[in-house]
Amino acid sequence: MSNDQKWIKSLPSDLQNQVNALVEAHPPSLTVIHKLCEYFKTNASEHEDKRRKLSSDPEIKSEGHVPEALSGPKSEVPGQIHEQEIIFELPQISFQSPIRKKLNLIFHLLVEPGQSPKPVMSLALPTTYVPEISIHNLASSIRLCVLLPILGNSTNNTKRNIGLLCFWIHDDAASDPNKNDPIICQVNFDQVKKQLIKAGKIPAEAETQLKEMNESNQSQDGIKAINEAIINFLQKQFQLCGIHMINYLPSSSATKNKLTINTDAGVAVSSNANSVNDLVMVEAYKGARDGAVLMLTANEYNQPYIIFGFKKPILIFDISKVQHVSYSNITRLTYSMIVTVVNEKKDSKVETLEFGMIDQKYFQIMDEFIKSQGINDNSFDEDLREKVTTNANSGEGEQASEQAAPADSDDEEEDGTFQVGQEEEGESSVDEEYDSNAGSDGDSDVGEEEDDTNENNEGANPAASTEADDVVTQSKEEDDEQ
């Protein structure tokens, strides 16, 4: 065999036999086949060089370009995701971070030359299956993955099967840690169930069968048994790809994920269905921005966290970085919680975050959680008490304490770079709250109200005033006569 024909030996044995049979039957065909192979070899090499050039040019972005906020050590997914590469997917999911759009959440395999296939999580367009965001090295890139109930939905029978699926990325897996927004989406498990039934992946009668099996031990506040089975399946799929998803949705079984509090403004979940809460989530404000404070206990995969979300910017910090917690602005209905935390992103600078307008009915359960994590209550700190005293000396008393507003007003929704401690220099929620001049406008208002009251009293009853003048005049005349 000549050197020109050595390429035949590189073919699979079946294909070799077919080529040899063709050449024996039609000897001139060997030249045509050889030219055909040379043509494809040359064009494939040129295509690879061109693709490599495009990938190395920073000004040229392919369709599968990963946004800067989620880039870094991750490599991009070139072009469309093919059906044979998909491990599983959740189609038409509503994402609210880092982008607001309906996308397919896809776990798929990425095969790179000379490497074994690796699982990748991509957010892809439903029509083209071209990724807008892709996360590689899932086991080391994902910091926290949780499935959460949504405040206001857990009390509604028609909405409690909708959960919030959240992925937080490690800062060292992003090119810019200050723009490292989490991936957050709403998953309607009733819709997922219909999609799986339509695809033939679960039988149509499965829901009825599971409901009958769990009827004797069913929780009235839990999600449907079929949806819980789907979540268990997803957890296994996530784990195969390197992600440990922690589920906090209330269980259909009375022996796990029990709701110890279930209101429109607050939810608490006990994973073991006992008195120990593993999730506490309540409505709160940070400045003028409304949201929810979440507190998560540690588990076998994650450390404990405090989170504020779910409008940008979304905050997350380790409970181990919390120095202490204090309570202020306490009224009959609401109170504020001030968290003092070490911000490692700013050279371990100590920062304070205030979460206000928390309903008093959740104070005990939140305070119990704080104490269970070994966090000190610093409400009677002397520095804070001195500032309150200064306020009292300015003439406002209790009114100043109640009117002092949380200082960190983070209502700049467009600021997606905010993280813990990323406020403007000079801002401090505690400093402004206890500033002796914080209520000076209130003093003026009170003074004006008092002046208005005096004026109103003077002119309130002109007839009575005239009658009083007549009595005085008559008394003087009687004295003169005497």
Swiss-Prot record:
MF GO annotations: DNA binding; histone binding; nucleosome binding
Keywords carried by this UniProt record: Chaperone, Chromosome, DNA-binding, Nucleus, Transcription, Transcription regulation
The UniProt record lists the keyword Cell inner membrane: no
Compartment list: Nucleus; Chromosome
Signal peptide: none
InterPro entries for this protein: PH-like_dom_sf, RTT106/SPT16-like_middle_dom, RTT106/SSRP1_HistChap/FACT, Rtt106_PH
Assembly mode: Interacts with histones H3 and H4.
Similarity comment: family membership: Belongs to the RTT106 family.
Name of protein: Histone chaperone RTT106
